[in-house]
Amino acid sequence: MTKYIFVTGGVVSSLGKGITAASLGRLLKNRGLNVTIQKFDPYINVDPGTMSPYQHGEVFVTDDGAETDLDLGHYERFIDINLNKYSNVTTGKIYSSVLQKERRGEYLGGTVQVIPHITNEIKERVYRSGRETNADVVITEIGGTVGDIESLPFLEAIRQIKSDIGRDNVMYIHCTLIPYLKAAGEMKTKPTQHSVKELRSLGIQPNIIVVRTELPVSQDMKDKLALFCDIDTKAVIEARDADTLYAVPLSLQEQNMDQIVCDHLKLDNPAADMTDWTALVNKVRNLSKKTKIALVGKYVELQDAYISVVEALRHAGYSFDTDVEVKWVNAEHVTAENVKELVGDTDGILVPGGFGDRGVEGKIVAIQYARENKVPFLGICLGMQLASIEFARNVLGLEGANSSEINPDTPYAIIDLLPEQKDVEDLGGTLRLGLYPCKLAEETNAYNAYNEPVVYERHRHRYEFNNQFRPDMEKAGFVFSGTSPDGRLVEIIELQDHPWFVAAQFHPELVSRPNRPQPLFHDFVSASITNKESK
């Protein structure tokens, strides 16, 4: 029978529930269990696709095209699995589904209420995740903080699940904070006690408490928490700030967290073999070289907006025993006069994805600098589109060339709407989303990176390269190294007389793993290291 683990949070948000859930998933997978994982977000948006990155951070796209929470990126990178649309559930999705059922008459004239209809829909999403993946264990992270009004239906639903399928098949893990009061010189357990009290008042008794802390938690403090929260002392798990996220699974294993979980759920799988993971962490902690990459974006104040990009750069660096330092460059501040000052000390330049016109001209200036000064360049999504526009303006001399997204009246729409997008009015969930094939041209940097004729990558865009400009740009040295299999859509572009200048319409960062870097990132970092060594 499938086992279910629920991870909740208390006291404050951003405690690392997602990393805790992902780390536990890795430990259980290494015990030979088939693990899947999901995130429940209590906001009323159907998905984060139209939310500002300042509000939500990065939008992570799954193979099947779901726009999801950035925690799914952590899940995939840690557990090394590909998740799907069932892995992220929001209040908006739940209510939308229930209202559609009501309109179809599925409730037989009954009064539709939070209990049982909303809670039943939530439970169905939990069970479906296990069914669709044939999982031994389903880990579900509940977003928000215990005590929030928005979270109540989710907490009630997961309370009911224990009654539905039995205590041996359900486990609750609660993540809290033990703050250190500098003035008093002591750590305080009271916020954790009150958070657990709130959770218990809702009918949920946590089996494990994971306490986030800056300093070591004494045995006396663990005993106190165990007494007041009614759990075993060994089930108080310390989550200290780590020098690398990838060390967290090893810290949890040292405290026997995965064994406690298996004992409670009556799973007799052998201990997790973390030899390879330990080797990875040791490598990360002992990188001997450095390279600096400029990330030119418009959300640089909130680095979570580009979290998968940064992780993909780091993964690539691990292959070369290199610590990749990211220099955050606000695209709105970049001009032709100061671009050298802002990016001249870096070994490579990356322009990530985005929407809208803010910061676009600054990104184009940075791309021009990379092209003219032979600096390794990687463009992603909008970065690929702007690389095309920069070439059209400054090499072909098409003054005013632009994207019809940025300037609908441009005389040269190098980037235009996909034909199937012309009549689309809704913004949410209507992009070209998910995994699509890309055919690679031989004897190109793209082909050399993948060493395969056809690859599959995840997309999230509405605009595409305008094919009427293809012949002129090819004549001028612009290489279309990746297209859709029918040749209609441009997927990857690069330059002929440049050491390494590649840009992709898709989002390669989404499939990178710490032990398996994404090929374009791998070769981009390699080219950046070579550039540094040649200076």
From Swiss-Prot:
Residues 1-267 are annotated as: Amidoligase domain. It catalyses: UTP + L-glutamine + ATP + H2O = CTP + L-glutamate + ADP + phosphate + 2 H(+); L-glutamine + H2O = L-glutamate + NH4(+); UTP + NH4(+) + ATP = CTP + ADP + phosphate + 2 H(+). ATP binds at residues 14-19, 71, 240-242. Pathway: Pyrimidine metabolism; CTP biosynthesis via de novo pathway; CTP from UDP: step 2/2. Homotetramer. Catalyzes the ATP-dependent amination of UTP to CTP with either L-glutamine or ammonia as the source of nitrogen. Regulates intracellular CTP levels through interactions with the four ribonucleotide triphosphates. This is CTP synthase.
